[in-house]
């Protein structure tokens, strides 16, 4: 049943009481010897093949991490974990709710709600990310900087999904490998802030932390953290994912349709000639497949796999949606398939790392030029002590010049520790500037330069560029300057709709996909020529 933001919350409550289940020990994640609260085990769907539920591990024993890494990480990984053990650690970036009793009641209500995603889907994503770590797949992760209640409608969801489909088709053809499509959608509300308060004209109010916490209007009522927003965020996330599932499996994602969209883009792009050749080759490939008997109405050509992700920031909410999976005996945060820890909350002894080390979802780590290589090795050891491929994705956000200087040291440290990770470029956050009009923006040329640096470094180091992570939208906004359909500083205010950071619009996103696809193609052809020598 599709969820609606207009539904009453009582209609979402389960009809039967939750049943306490024994907590199962497992080899790969921390366990707890006592039940903290009643947990209803969630059986994984999409996992009828039991072999698909087997965690991927490295094919041969990895090299032991450096002694300093082992000593620092072992103390954390040996500690008993429970779904609320994070409360014993220092938690940064959490809002202060004035009404704690109301917060407690809201969290209890969400605990009783159904999961938004399923454990089997998260396991399947981990397998796919393991392929990306080995250079056999490519991650495309994109969506809003921060989802909002005001802009929640089917058209916006459809447009972002559509552009991700178009980008995925281009990247898949360029790299001749599967593209893992993950949306920053269906839960990407909360945002970390550098300051707890914002001051305007002598008035000081709490900072806006995302629509699931407070409102962006600068008044006391809007800025006061409201627990009821968590329930609305849950309902919007569930409704968004419901629509995404329908789009992914109902024919909207048909490859022939996506290819025609890309051909239309090249016809109307100022640099269309540059991209038309690739788009035409995709169209010809579909014609060949049709002639060979793999018709375009085959299920593999009309459906796609799609996963959701968001930053793991609001720990009380994440805990409320954590469930014990009856298939594996592992805990999964069922708010999203993939969660990442941000630059501001990745402290080794912090609450966010403590929570994430105990859930079985695939995890991301945002890494800037401030990250020390040895600290990264320690963090990976805490979050992935069994060295499972696909468990950890490193999302680098540095700016082009810092990327060339800092990334090689991180790659060498991780490789030296024998750790398996998927390397991904976030070319957005390291390239934010302030326009003359005062609005934040990101130059497309700087974004492109960071992606180029990412590929250059991996080529230099002999490692695998595993994907890109983008803040983007399917709407025709004017938030990032540049691109073939040039957006100038003067254009910014005309369609500047973001609630937080500037996003690539549909045209800029697809243009970047064509650029990356060409780089993937050159890398593939280079590898083939080396093998042919």
Curated annotation (Swiss-Prot):
Its cofactor is Mn(2+). It is found in: Plastid, Chloroplast. It is an enzyme of class 2 (transferase). Binds 1 divalent metal cation per subunit that could be manganese. Residues 47-56 have a biased composition (Polar residues). Belongs to the class-II DAHP synthase family. Involved in the production of volatile organic compounds (VOCs), including floral volatile benzenoids and phenylpropanoids (FVBP), in flowers of fragrant cultivars (e.g. cv. Mitchell and cv. V26), scent attracting pollinators (e.g. the night-active hawkmoth pollinator Manduca sexta). Catalyzes an aldol-like condensation reaction between phosphoenolpyruvate (PEP) and D-erythrose 4-phosphate (E4P) to generate 3-deoxy-D-arabino-heptulosonate 7-phosphate (DAH7P) and inorganic phosphate. GO terms for cellular component: chloroplast. Keywords: Amino-acid biosynthesis, Aromatic amino acid biosynthesis, Chloroplast, Manganese, Metal-binding, Plastid, Transferase, Transit peptide. Mostly expressed in flowers, especially in petal limbs and tubes, and, to a lower extent, in roots, stems, stigmas, anthers, leaves and sepals. Substrate binds at residues 184, 343-344, 366, 397. Induction: Triggered by EOBI in flowers. This is Phospho-2-dehydro-3-deoxyheptonate aldolase 1, chloroplastic. Residues 57-70 have a biased composition (Low complexity). Homodimer. It comes from Petunia hybrida (Petunia). Residues 1-57 form a transit peptide. The gene is DAHP1. One of its GO terms (molecular function) is 3-deoxy-7-phosphoheptulonate synthase activity. It catalyses: D-erythrose 4-phosphate + phosphoenolpyruvate + H2O = 7-phospho-2-dehydro-3-deoxy-D-arabino-heptonate + phosphate. Mn(2+) binds at residues 145, 429, 471, 501.
């Amino acid at each position: 049943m599709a969820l609606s933001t207009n539904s009453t919350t009582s209609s979402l409550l389960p009809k039967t009481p939750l049943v306490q289940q024994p907590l199962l020990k497992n080899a790969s994640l921390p366990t707890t010897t006592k039940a903290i609260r009643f947990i209803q085990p969630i059986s994984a769907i999409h996992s009828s093949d039991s072999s698909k539920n087997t965690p991927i591990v490295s094919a041969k024993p990895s090299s032991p991490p450096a002694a300093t890494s082992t000593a620092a990480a072992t103390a954390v990984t040996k500690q008993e974990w429970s779904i609320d053990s994070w409360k014993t650690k220092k938690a940064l970036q959490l809002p202060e709710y004035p009404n704690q009793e109301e917060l407690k009641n809201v969290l209890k209500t969400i605990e009783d709600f159904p999961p938004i995603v399923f454990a089997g889907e998260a396991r399947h994503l981990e397998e796919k990310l393991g392929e990306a770590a080995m250079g056999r797949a490519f991650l495309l992760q994109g969506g809003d900087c921060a989802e909002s209640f005001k802009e929640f409608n089917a058209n916006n969801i459809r447009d972002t999904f559509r552009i991700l489909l178009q980008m995925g088709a281009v990247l898949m053809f360029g790299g001749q490998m599967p593209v893992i499509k993950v949306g920053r959608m269906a839960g990407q509300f909360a945002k970390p802030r550098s300051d707890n308060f914002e001051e305007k004209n002598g008035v000081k109010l709490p900072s806006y932390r995302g629509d699931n916490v407070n409102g962006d209007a600068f008044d006391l009522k809007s800025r006061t953290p409201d627990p009821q927003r968590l329930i609305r965020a849950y309902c919007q996330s569930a409704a968004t994912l419901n629509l995404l599932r329908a789009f992914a499996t109902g024919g909207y994602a048909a490859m022939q349709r996506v290819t025609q969209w890309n051909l239309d883009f090249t016809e109307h792009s100022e640099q269309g000639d540059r991209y038309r050749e690739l788009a035409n080759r995709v169209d010809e490939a579909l014609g060949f497949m049709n002639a060979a008997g793999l018709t375009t109405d085959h299920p593999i050509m009309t459906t796609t796999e799609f996963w959701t992700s968001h930053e793991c920031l609001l720990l009380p909410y994440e805990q409320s949606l954590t469930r014990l999976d009856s298939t594996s005996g592992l805990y999964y945060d069922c708010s999203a398939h993939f969660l990442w820890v941000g630059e501001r909350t990745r402290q080794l002894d912090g609450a966010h790392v403590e929570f994430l080390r105990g859930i079985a979802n695939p995890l991301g780590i945002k890494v800037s030029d401030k990250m020390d290589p040895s600290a990264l090795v320690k963090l990976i050891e805490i979050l992935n002590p069994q060295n499972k491929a696909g468990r950890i994705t490193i999302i680098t956000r540095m700016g082009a010049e810092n990327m060339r200087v800092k990334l090689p040291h991180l790659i060498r440290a991780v490789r030296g520790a024998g750790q398996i990770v998927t390397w991904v470029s976030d070319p957005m956050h390291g390239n934010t500037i302030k326009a003359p009009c005062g609005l934040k923006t990101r130059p497309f040329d700087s974004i492109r330069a960071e992606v180029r640096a990412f590929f250059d470094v991996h080529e230099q180091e002999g490692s695998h560029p595993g994907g890109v992570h983008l803040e983007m939208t399917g709407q025709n906004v004017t938030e990032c300057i540049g691109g073939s359909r040039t957006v100038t500083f003067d254009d910014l205010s005309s369609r500047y709709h973001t609630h937080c950071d500037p996003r690539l619009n549909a045209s800029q996103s697809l243009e970047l996909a064509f650029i990356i696809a060409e780089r993937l193609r050159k890398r593939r052809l280079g590898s083939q020529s080396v093998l042919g020598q």
